[in-house]
């Protein structure tokens, strides 16, 4: 058979409405906080851009296999209007002219959850719906993958993001995608909307690995960095509320969680000076300037922005901490 004939057959076999994204994923809700999340790993590139969908106070969706991304937006729209996740999924599958190759899971803010695996999803394919979660997979090495995901999720410790990652690890340990691995994504949204739909507001975590030899390792690294960013954002909120000691504690957590991100050390040290703790800031600035000297110039620009004391004596002392050229 010619390459052209093979391509034509492949196009005929492709479910209409979107690209192919064979994969494994999980949608879940934390019953304590109400936060909701979706996590995914696939051999397809940039899987997070089409598979994972979520909105604070509404729900989360994973749409995969012969993907119709419309299940994401339409599913959230129905749940936003009060339709339960199971009913929303049922309605969308019924309207789909080519549902046989789809695999979709939906979960709403009340924890109602449902999944669908079409009869033409490539084996091994299936799903398992548990309390406040669903795991689903297709084109896997074997039929143990989604049950391994469920077991890993149910036994995992930590917050929802940690448990979502554990489910992905469980899938990979059971064999994972028969083709290997390439990309991954994790999204966690709040139980209720704050009106700020971005990361740092309604999106507690939103990390994607577009292409990597070991996407789950990279996803975990990115999650750690974003977690540090969350601490830093919380520190800013506490400083605004004049809760200085609490703010300094979370700024320090951010710095310690991601020591390679020197900017976190910079802002922690700068804040220490602002609150008259220059002695504590001195070793931090000395270390920082020795690694990346440009931070001294950044510091010099802060007084004009109202973010550092406008005191020449303080700035002169800071300058002495930088290494001599």
What do these predicted regions represent?
Residues 9-179, 210-243, 256:
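Alpha/propeptide regions of enzymes that mature by internal proteolysis
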Residues 259, 293-294:
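Short coil turns that delineate tetratricopeptide repeat
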């Amino acid at each position: 058979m010619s390459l052209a004939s093979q391509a034509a057959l492949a196009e005929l076999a492709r479910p209409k409405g979107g690209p192919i994204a064979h994969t494994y994923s999980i949608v879940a809700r934390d019953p304590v906080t109400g936060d909701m999340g979706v996590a995914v790993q696939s051999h397809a590139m940039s899987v997070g851009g089409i598979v994972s969908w979520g909105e604070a106070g509404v729900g989360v969706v994973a749409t995969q296999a012969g993907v119709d991304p419309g299940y994401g937006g339409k599913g959230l729209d129905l749940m936003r209007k009060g339709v339960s996740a199971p009913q929303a999924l049922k309605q969308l599958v019924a309207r789909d002219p080519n549902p046989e190759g789809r695999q979709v899971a939906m979960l709403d803010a009340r924890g109602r959850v449902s999944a669908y695996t079409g009869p033409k999803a490539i084996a091994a394919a299936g799903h398992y719906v548990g309390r406040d979660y669903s795991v689903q997979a297709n084109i896997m090495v074997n039929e143990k993958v989604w049950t391994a995901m469920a077991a890993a999720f149910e036994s995992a410790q930590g917050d929802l993001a940690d448990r979502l990652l554990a489910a992905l690890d469980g899938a990979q340990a059971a064999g994972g995608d028969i083709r290997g691995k390439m990309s991954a994504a994790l999204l966690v949204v709040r139980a209720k909307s704050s009106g700020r739909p971005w990361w740092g507001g309604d999106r507690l975590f939103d990390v994607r690995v577009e292409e990597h030899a070991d996407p789950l390792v990279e996803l975990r690294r990115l999650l750690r960095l974003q977690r540090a960013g969350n601490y830093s954002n919380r520190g800013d909120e506490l400083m605004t509320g004049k809760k200085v000691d609490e703010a300094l504690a979370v700024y320090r957590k951010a710095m310690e969680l991601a020591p390679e991100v020197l900017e976190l050390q910079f802002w922690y040290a700068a804040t220490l000076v602002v609150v008259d703790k220059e002695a504590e800031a001195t070793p931090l600035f000395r270390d920082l300037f020795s690694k990346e000297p440009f931070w001294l110039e950044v510091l010099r620009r802060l007084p004009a922005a109202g973010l550092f004391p406008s005191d020449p004596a303080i700035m002169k002392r800071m300058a002495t901490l930088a290494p001599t050229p």
